[in-house]
């Protein structure tokens, strides 16, 4: 497959981050040095050239995105409460500490990132960690649960999931849900709207290339669901089951599905369940890449759009595409 095959997807998945303390960037050698040891490409030999560890020594990595303005990746260490940037060479830069438990991110057309945080906020920031601004922390006057992952449409509409993970111990405070449900939300023209509240643990989210379908992973049911955006007229709509993920042969820790990305050919790359599953637009499995631990998320990017940054437990990996 040609490198240009994935180039469009690389531009469409980013964000920066977050919250309160710690301005200024700092180049560091944080994290252990890259082993650069090649790993299994599983059954994805037609798509993948190589999988290799880029850096380790973190707590729980999440929220990868490519920053095209600085030609580097941005990602979160959720439980380390820190946001990092990392160059393709492995050079690590600390962007923000005591950051608000940042999680998923996605890139807006103006080059800023939308960042979901487990401190119950949705924010924007630049790729260098500056310009932090709050977007939303409430819906209908009540606190959000813990914004988890983000996708941005071609018109800069923002879609995010709001499961309870951050208020169940994976954030700064334990609390009851103010709404009593986990939501999938849309932010557009300064307004926040509820798309769906039927999933108990909505996690990853990604929009289709034609902008008509939202893919949502529900960790607790091991499934991915679709939401028809053309049906949304301001009132929550139902979701339909798209695929159920099975554990990956040779993969390690096998939690339910997590982060999602849609490639330029419409295939869905789903993390979790011991690695990454690549699905066709009809939900059929194309291939799988095993990883030793649960994969929390992935993002297309790189200088030529032919790389993926994978976040998994205490490490980040690169996947080089054919």
Language model feature labels by segment:
Residues 18-20:
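C-terminal motif of bacterial Sec signal peptides marking the signal peptidase cleavage site
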Residues 82-84, 121-123, 183-185, 223-225, ...:
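A short loop-to-beta-strand structural motif that recurs across blades of beta-propeller domains
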Residues 227-235, 321-322:
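Short loop/turn segments immediately following beta-strands, especially the blade-tip
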Residues 56-72, 98-117, 121, 140-158, ...:
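Beta-rich, blade/repeat-based domains predominating
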Residues 38-58, 239-242:
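A short helix->beta-strand "capping" segment at the edge of beta-propeller domains
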Residues 160-178:
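Short, conserved, GDST-rich strand-edge loop motifs in beta-rich repeat architectures
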Residues 73-94:
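Beta-propeller domains
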Residues 22-24:
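Bacterial signal peptide processing site
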